[in-house]
Amino acid sequence: MTSIEPTHTGKKVIVGMSGGVDSSVSAYLLMQQGYQVEGLFMKNWEEDDNDEYCAAAEDLKDAQAVCDKLGIKLHTVNFAAEYWDNVFEYFLAEYKAGRTPNPDIMCNKEIKFKAFLDFADDILDADYIAMGHYVRRRDNADGTTQMLRGVDNNKDQSYFLYTLSHEQVARSLFPVGELEKHEVREIAKKMGLITHDKKDSTGICFIGERKFTEFLGNYLPAQPGNIETAEGEIIGKHQGLMYQTLGQRKGLGIGGMKNSNDDPWYVVDKDLKRNVLVVGQGGHHPRLMSNGMLVNQLHWVDRKGPAEGSQIVVKTRYRQQDIPCTLTYLDDNTLKVVFDEPVAAVTPGQSAVFYDGEVCLGGGIIDQLIRG
């Protein structure tokens, strides 16, 4: 097991305790390294806080049980107002504009590594914070700090953390980033932690498991419209463009069409002006493919970013294979990205995250697609 910053032994670390196995093992590993460890549990959602939807109470119970087992303090904090103002309203605005946002990325930026870090600094006098994310940090001889992909390729979460600043990365520790997921569970089981076999959380950051269309419909009125083929034939109805994303295959309700082949139907475009969902057959339909994209709202971990003309790789969604590409800066905040080969289902509103080998450089928001 790789050691974590032995030169900082004795420093105070506040661990974001979620009630899951990754944060539980993070706290244990840091204690083993000699850090002074305390936990902090965040509650960030108030609406619909009931047994059906919200597991916050159960998560807090598990976090407390782990901290009791490890013999460390557990603090609690409510960031619901910050979450609503800085994450959820952005999430709704993007969907209303017809884009597909990634709330987990904004949640990390505004809550886990901003509000949390501020609280750990101002109230708990922390030297570092730590999270159970599968990423790594590297401190270089020149004083710079880089964020690296996690050792477990299947669990690497650097895509969700590209908005972190150099300063935030330098103040953060990521113990499980050096491990495979199965190793984390094995450590938790060996230590008798209640979370060792707890299911990984999915769904919207901090909002949890719920029916997405029903949940979104509580905040944005649905606007049903036509489903058309790429050739303009009306073949069905959709319940709202905000519920659909490029490349989507399931839930379209248009199977068994006459005069069509057996290839599955995919969302290939969204016509916002006409409120029309455009579909085509086959996962490599021409309307689904892009030769490149324009990316704005750029953020680079090292503040500088890659050089003009750099040939690096990009991910346009989580767990995607690396896409080789070439970069051209159109201005300080807009990047033209040309793929080596056409790519399917690149989605405006999602994040494009760039890598040089194992180093996460940063990224931005996909604004426009380059086709043809």
UniProtKB/Swiss-Prot annotation:
Q: Which NCBIfam families match?
A: PRK00143.1, trmU
Location relative to the cell: Cytoplasm
Protein encoded by which gene: mnmA
A Gene Ontology molecular function term for this protein is: tRNA binding
The record lists the organism as Shewanella sp. (strain ANA-3)
What EC designation does it have? 2.8.1.13
Q: What protein does this entry describe?
A: tRNA-specific 2-thiouridylase MnmA
| Record-level GO cellular component terms | cytoplasm
Spell out the residue ranges making up region: Interaction with tRNA.
Answer: 155-157, 317-318
